[in-house]
């Protein structure tokens, strides 16, 4: 998620009156809400004593809605109207989720913008689905706290981009929540363990949930948290362990593998057994295939670990990638925090300990740790805590503009801590140009065609001037939640235009990793392509200037000079049709050399016109 500047917003007028605030972990599989009660971060429970709320929503024909456990119970009978894992779809376009579509039991509606889901209650967006989950969590908080919270800190993955963060804020707004901050999940976990109050160092946050895996490397320095690197696998989690065990059980027991009721029974038993074996060495599984007597199967922890070992090993490449991106060695990691229910599995903890060469922190329930950190942060933001807490996130990819020739001018490089604002001046390319098109892009490549387009807007009303005279100041501003605003202003008139970037789709961690990898693989090639494009832009500028000068003052040249200049201009035109940057640059320089007599005479002529009819005294003035 985006890291943020958090300053003390002020304390309550009455020092004994605490303001109500909540922290929400809006998860892919489960969600939960917490608050600081009597100075103790506490996760809130429902009427049945459960603190986890399944992130599942079921829409009913009569307009009713089931959220959480009732929705899960009906998933088998009503899969098309029961929406799970909506978080995977937040801020995503229809084209982005084609790889997921075949694995989703519900129907996606084709169209532009954010993906929508077809239900008996009409089309629903992931934002609307998430809002229902947040609404239930808010109601739980109101009942527990005895009043409306002033605001909420909601956690998001560190790799969430502008679109995904904005979608999360929109969902909260629909649920009637005032969002104090969006907080990176790994940062929230670190806050929960009080790492912000300890010594400086570098920490790894290993987050293995039900459906996703994330690894984040944080640096704590002078009270500031900074996310150095993130990596992960959005298709890896505890569910994969359940499926691995379920497949083995079906092979052992037989039964009709195509029968959804049988598969659901086996999967549920597998999940229960996995959870039990986190505490005991052996457990019994009871299966009742259709038309057959019930059968008991003894399952040991050792057998489970052998079955799930390939699953948990899949998390290690991402760990290595995060360390490599952060430029760190294993011995530089001060501590490892475990997040996510799947990290309760002893085999996972053993593997993490072996990989990082140290015992991970496990004192706080891994299901609760993110919500607890969010609650602590929310408590600080409403003024209940005296100490400042500064949290910083970084941009996952560079932000920039398209310039002439399809080149990218990076304004804010990747890994820049946010919030941040950067400005740069640009100018016009042609004489009399009165408008400029601004194209905002994201990525590490040198050419626009290889980057992701974020937004386009125009600045109009630029005073007509010669090419290169106008000054257009473009400012990029990324706020604490990672949302981008771009403003363009012509400095002499104050004419301005701006856009708040809210893309209709987002990027996941694999897409960000792919974009970074492409920038490394094609680095040398991009340098060559950029050099060629820059040479062509400069060549076109020289050719345009030559046309303008000849149209106005060709009579200042003698025939030999005009012939030499025409010949140089033709050579430049021919060079521009080729792909040799060196040839283009040499041809442009030859034109400028041949044009020197014309340039000098134009200046002399302009000077004579300026002083004609004026006295020496007037010129002195």
From Swiss-Prot:
Disulphide linkage map: none
Keywords: ATP-binding, Chaperone, Nucleotide-binding
Keyword ATP-binding on entry: yes
GO MF terms, alphabetically ordered: ATP binding; ATP hydrolysis activity; ATP-dependent protein folding chaperone; unfolded protein binding
One GO BP annotation of this record: iron-sulfur cluster assembly
Transmembrane segments: none
PROSITE patterns listed in its UniProt record: HSP70_1 (PS00297), HSP70_2 (PS00329), HSP70_3 (PS01036)
PANTHER family listed in its UniProt record: HEAT SHOCK PROTEIN 70KDA
Family, as annotated: Belongs to the heat shock protein 70 family.
UniProt protein name: Chaperone protein HscA homolog
Species: Acidithiobacillus ferrooxidans (strain ATCC 23270 / DSM 14882 / CIP 104768 / NCIMB 8455) (Ferrobacillus ferrooxidans (strain ATCC 23270))
């Amino acid at each position: 998620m985006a890291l943020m500047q958090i300053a003390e917003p002020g304390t309550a007028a009455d020092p004994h009156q605490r303001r109500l605030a909540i922290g929400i972990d809006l998860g892919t599989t489960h969600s939960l809400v917490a608050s600081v009660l009597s100075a103790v971060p506490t996760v809130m429970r429902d009427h049945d004593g459960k603190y986890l709320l399944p992130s599942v929503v079921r829409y009913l024909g009569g307009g009713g809605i089931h959220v959480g456990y009732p929705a899960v119970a009906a998933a088998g009978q009503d899969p098309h109207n029961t929406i799970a894992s909506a978080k995977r779809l937040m801020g995503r376009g229809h084209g982005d989720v084609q790889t997921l579509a075949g694995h989703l039991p519900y129907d996606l509606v084709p169209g532009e913008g954010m993906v929508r889901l077809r239900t008996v209650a009409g089309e629903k967006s992931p934002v609307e689905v998430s809002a229902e989950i947040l609404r239930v969590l808010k109601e739980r908080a109101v009942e527990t706290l005895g009043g409306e919270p002033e605001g909420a800190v909601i956690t998001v993955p560190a790799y969430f981009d502008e679109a995904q963060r904005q979608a999360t804020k929109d969902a909260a707004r629909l649920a009637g929540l005032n969002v104090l901050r969006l907080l990176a999940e790994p940062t929230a976990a670190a806050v929960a363990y009080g790492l912000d109050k300890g010594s400086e160092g570098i920490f790894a946050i290993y987050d293995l949930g039900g459906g996703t895996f994330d690894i984040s490397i944080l640096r704590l320095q002078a009270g500031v948290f900074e996310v150095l690197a993130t990596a992960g696998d959005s298709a890896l989690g505890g569910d994969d362990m359940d499926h691995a065990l379920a497949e083995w059980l079906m092979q052992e027991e037989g039964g009709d593998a195509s029968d959804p009721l049988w598969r659901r029974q086996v999967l549920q038993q597998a999940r229960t057994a996995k959870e039990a074996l986190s505490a005991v060495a052996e457990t019994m599984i009871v299966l009742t295939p259709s038309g057959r007597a019930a059968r008991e199967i003894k399952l040991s922890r050792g057998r489970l670990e052998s079955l799930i070992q390939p699953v948990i090993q899949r998390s290690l490449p991402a760990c290595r990638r995060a360390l490599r991106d952060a430029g760190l060695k294993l011995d530089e990691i001060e501590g490892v925090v475990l997040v996510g229910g799947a990290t309760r599995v002893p085999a996972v903890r053993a593997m993490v300990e072996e990989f990082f060469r140290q015992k991970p922190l496990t004192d706080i329930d891994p299901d609760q740790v993110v919500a607890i950190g969010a609650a602590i942060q929310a408590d600080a933001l409403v003024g209940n805590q005296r100490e400042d807490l500064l949290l910083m996130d970084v941009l996952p990819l560079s932000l920039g503009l398209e310039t002439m020739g399809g080149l990218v001018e990076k304004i804010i490089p990747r890994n820049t801590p946010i919030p941040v604002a950067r400005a740069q001046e640009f100018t016009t390319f042609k004489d009399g140009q009165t408008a400029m098109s601004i194209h905002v892009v994201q990525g590490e490549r040198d050419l626009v065609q290889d980057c992701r387009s974020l937004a386009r807007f125009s600045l109009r009303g630029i005073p007509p001037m010669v090419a290169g005279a106008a000054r257009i100041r473009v400012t990029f501003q990324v706020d604490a939640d990672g949302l981008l605003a771009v403003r363009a202003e012509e400095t002499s008139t104050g004419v301005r235009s701006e856009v708040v970037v809210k893309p209709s789709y987002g990027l996941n961690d694999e897409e960000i990793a792919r974009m970074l990898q492409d920038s490394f693989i094609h680095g040398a090639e991009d340098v060559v392509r950029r050099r060629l494009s820059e040479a062509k832009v400069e060549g076109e500028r020289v050719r345009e200037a030559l046309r303008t000068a000849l149209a106005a003052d060709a009579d200042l040249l003698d025939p030999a000079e005009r012939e030499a200049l025409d010949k140089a201009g033709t050579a430049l035109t021919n060079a521009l049709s080729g792909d040799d940057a060196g040839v283009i640059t040499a041809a442009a320089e030859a034109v400028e050399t041949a044009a020197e007599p014309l340039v000098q005479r134009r200046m002399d002529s302009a000077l004579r016109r300026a002083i004609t009819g004026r006295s020496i005294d007037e010129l002195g003035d």
